[in-house]
Amino acid sequence: MSRIGYKVVNLPEGVEVKQDGNVVTVKGPKGELTREFSDKITIKVEGNEVSFERSAEDNKTKALHGTTRSNFHNMVVGVSEGFKKELELRGVGYRAQMKGKTLVLNVGYSHPVEFEEEEGITFETPSATSIIVSGINKEEVGDCAARIRATRAPEPYKGKGIRYVGEYVRRKEGKTGK
């Protein structure tokens, strides 16, 4: 049984929490995030500590307890520090570049693949073969990075494609000739 829901979240300096029923707003130096949580979990803000209590002991509520605490913690980290995902391109001629607020990928298709910056998400290309996706919402940063990776996922024979930095791609052996 996980006990993550019982851990108290400490608020860093410059982060403030407003609660309106089940809707919680976290404001910090990087921005502001609002989220609606389940009414089965009670959120208590005391000074610079936030605790979570569940109303029932059924399995659904127990699962929500830890999830609520983790989601809230991610909101606090997002508005104070932010999140980023780094991707790298491997393959001959695979390149990424920024054109204004648009990320343009040349990844072996007959056409370049373009991604517009969404609200709260920024792209950086420190080199032609690396991309950094950053923002304050962990879910949105992860989803956006996953969509970029899905345009050309790493293939198992040569390892070409877009991958997360540090991701291990399991390689396969090619066909053996006669």
From Swiss-Prot:
InterPro entries: Ribosomal_uL6-like, Ribosomal_uL6-like_a/b-dom_sf, Ribosomal_uL6_a/b-dom, Ribosomal_uL6_bac-type, Ribosomal_uL6_CS. Keywords: Ribonucleoprotein, Ribosomal protein, RNA-binding, rRNA-binding. One of its GO terms (molecular function) is rRNA binding. GO terms for cellular component: cytosolic large ribosomal subunit. It holds the Pfam family Ribosomal_L6. PROSITE patterns: RIBOSOMAL_L6_1. It comes from the Bacteria. One of its GO terms (biological process) is cytoplasmic translation. Belongs to the universal ribosomal protein uL6 family. This protein binds to the 23S rRNA, and is important in its secondary structure. It is located near the subunit interface in the base of the L7/L12 stalk, and near the tRNA binding site of the peptidyltransferase center. Part of the 50S ribosomal subunit. This is Large ribosomal subunit protein uL6. It comes from Ligilactobacillus salivarius (strain UCC118). The lineage of its organism: Bacteria, Bacillati, Bacillota, Bacilli, Lactobacillales. The gene is rplF.
